[in-house]
Amino acid sequence: AICTGADRPCAACCPCCPGTSCKAESNGVSYCRKDEP
């Protein structure tokens, strides 16, 4: 299974990798970012 790594744009094909979540950025693009502890 392919997942989207941290600091990469969220992709419909590939969920964010474990430990990261899709977060909307100020430029309107959503990126997978590391979860905050």
Swiss-Prot record:
UniProt subcellular location: Secreted
Keywords: Calcium-activated potassium channel impairing toxin, Disulfide bond, Ion channel impairing toxin, Knottin, Neurotoxin, Potassium channel impairing toxin, Secreted, Toxin
Annotated site residue numbers, Important for the neurotoxic activity: I2, V29
GO molecular function: potassium channel regulator activity; toxin activity
Site (Critical for the neurotoxic activity): R8, P9, C13, C14, Y31
Effect of R8A: 98-fold decrease in toxicity to flies
A Pfam family per the record: Toxin_16
Disulfide bonds, paired cysteine numbers: C3-C17, C10-C22, C13-C14, C16-C32
Any one of the GO CC terms: extracellular region
Tissue-level expression: Expressed by the venom gland.
Outcome of mutating I2A: 7-fold decrease in toxicity to flies
Chief location of this protein within or outside the cell: secreted
Coiled coil: none
More details: Negative results: does not affect a wide range of potassium, calcium and sodium voltage-gated channels.
General function of this protein: This excitatory toxin inhibits insect calcium-activated potassium (KCa) channels (Slo-type). Pan-neuronal expression in Drosophila is lethal but flies engineered to express the toxin only in clock neurons have defects in circadian rhythm but a normal lifespan.
Protein name: Lambda-hexatoxin-Hv1c
Organism: Hadronyche versuta
